[in-house]
């Protein structure tokens, strides 16, 4: 799988050892010149649907599970590896732990949606799936970086998503 960009390093982790590794899977769902992304009312940002890979799952199983949870996706088809991103960052809940997170991005389609199975924190943050143009997602995420993303562990999320958005904009020639 291609590496989309160099590792993003959260400020303050440069000289610290990596204590844990985390793997995530994320979907690039593109239809009618728009992406299906997950919007957070609290953070006013747009991220690719997906999440953490669990022990014992392969990456495709994890992707399908995450899309069922976040989007209510009943059927995920056309899954094709797109690329990966790495981040060295602080943990979200344990902010003294330094993680190396690898996010694997896959192109896919979802045509059949049912009920979501959101986690409590996703409900609390007001997350919902929305269709949005690539340019609008980039613009809104850049605004969110300036206003909302100053917490340890969150500082690499939107830069990562913006890098991927710009890369897929080129890929789709959008």
Residue ranges and their predicted role:
Residues 1-26:
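Acidic, metal-coordinating catalytic segment for phosphate/diphosphate chemistry
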Residues 27, 81, 104-106:
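A structural signal for short, well-ordered beta-strand segments
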Residues 30, 34-73:
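Conserved Nudix-box catalytic region and its N-terminal flanking loop in Nudix hydrolases
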Residues 33-35, 43-45, 54, 86-89, ...:
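Short, charged/polar surface micro-motifs in flexible loops or helix N-caps
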Residues 88-117, 130:
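Active-site-adjacent beta-strand/loop module that shapes the phosphate/pyrophosphate-binding cleft
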């Amino acid at each position: 799988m291609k590496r989309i960009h160099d590792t993003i390093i959260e400020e303050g982790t440069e000289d610290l050892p990596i204590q844990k590794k985390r793997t995530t899977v994320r979907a690039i769902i593109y239809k009618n010149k728009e992406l299906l992304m997950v919007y957070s009312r609290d953070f006013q940002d747009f991220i690719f649907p997906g999440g953490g890979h669990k022990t014992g799952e392969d990456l495709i199983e994890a992707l399908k599970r995450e899309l069922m949870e976040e989007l209510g996706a009943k059927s995920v088809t056309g899954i094709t590896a797109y690329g990966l991103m790495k981040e060295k960052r602080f943990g979200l809940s344990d902010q003294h732990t330094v993680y190396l997170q690898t996010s694997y991005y896959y192109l896919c389609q979802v045509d059949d949606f049912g009920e979501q199975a959101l986690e409590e924190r996703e409900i609390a943050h007001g997350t919902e799936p929305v269709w949005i143009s690539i340019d609008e997602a980039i613009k809104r995420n850049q605004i969110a970086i300036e206003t909302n993303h100053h917490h340890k562990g969150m500082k690499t999320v939107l830069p990562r998503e913006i890098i991927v958005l710009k890369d897929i904009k080129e890929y789709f020639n959008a």
